[in-house]
Amino acid sequence: CMVCDMVVTYAGNIKEYKFYPAVMRSHARLTYTQVWNWIEKGGDYPHKAQIEPLYKLFQILQKKRQQRGAMEFESTETQMLFDDGGKIERIVPVVRNDAHKLIEECMLAANVCAAEFLLKNKHTALFRNHLGPTPEKLATLREQLGLLGLHLGGGDKPTPKDYATLAEKIAN
């Protein structure tokens, strides 16, 4: 696997990073549910020395992302449960908790470092860019939102924070 070793400030800024190859050896075999139960209960638990600072990092990175106005997309993942014969018995929704989000937030930070590394070192790479709506589509959106008593800020170029604010108003 490839490791992205990062130094992150208490303000959530990535100060430095390096990439290097490694072999992953998972001795603990933890589940998201186990980790979340330990974090919620507090006290003493296995691997606390590793999990507690990682959870604090997650909280810092999440707060930083919210301040930037990043959109939160909550989706329901599913899990297949199999019978003894190996056939699908049923499909159930996976309940996401902060242990899931902790891993996702760290992966996002590593992806940002990877993109920066590729750009800084002038490596050819594909990036997925999310273009904003055309002026016509933006006008139509604003018209429809107005009918619902809603407003999208940001003038001609709404930022992700403007969209996140709107999404929050809709959710409430």
Predicted features along the sequence, with ranges:
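Conserved, carboxylate-rich catalytic/transport cores that coordinate ions
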Residues: C1-N172
